């Protein structure tokens, strides 16, 4: 019973509880599988999207001021894009600054106390623009259309995430 005295009809998805499709079969959601395995499998699917590719400057940049060196992995851009798509799906509508904070870290300032810093907003913005061009995310506006609330995933991205999660879940069993 809610605080207003009537039963709530809102159904909350509980982690580990699978949904059923129209035929009564169990469906696996992207929330049901391990994030690490989902991002790795989703990274492999990112090859199908031509718009998601690292710019030429991506080999020389750090991912934030808290890093000492650029990423070592060859496919770090696609991995970050897959991870960012998952984060937009879970936390959306979400903006560039909040995503950059999620990819931030602790900056070593020598003898001074460490300090929390955000990740690169430029990398975050460019990846979100590429996800928009690929049709995986879109901007959500408020009811009057005057203010941007952040990015959300499209139905195509939702089905992609659930399809990849189904593959990951079947590989685990």
Describe the role of every protein-language-model region.
Residues 132-145:
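A short, conserved structural fragment
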Residues 83-91, 102, 160:
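Short amphipathic alpha-helical elements of helix-turn-helix/winged-helix folds
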Residues 93-115:
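Short acidic, hydrophobic short linear motifs in intrinsically disordered regions
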Residues 148-173:
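Short, amphipathic alpha-helical interaction segments positioned at domain boundaries
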Residues 72, 86-92, 115-119:
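Short basic-aromatic helix/loop recognition motifs at nucleic-acid
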Residues 4-82, 86:
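Long, low-complexity, charged/polar intrinsically disordered regions in eukaryotic proteins
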Residues 112-128:
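Major-groove recognition helix of helix-turn-helix-like DNA-binding domains
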Residues 99, 124-134:
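Basic amphipathic alpha-helical segments that dock to polyanions
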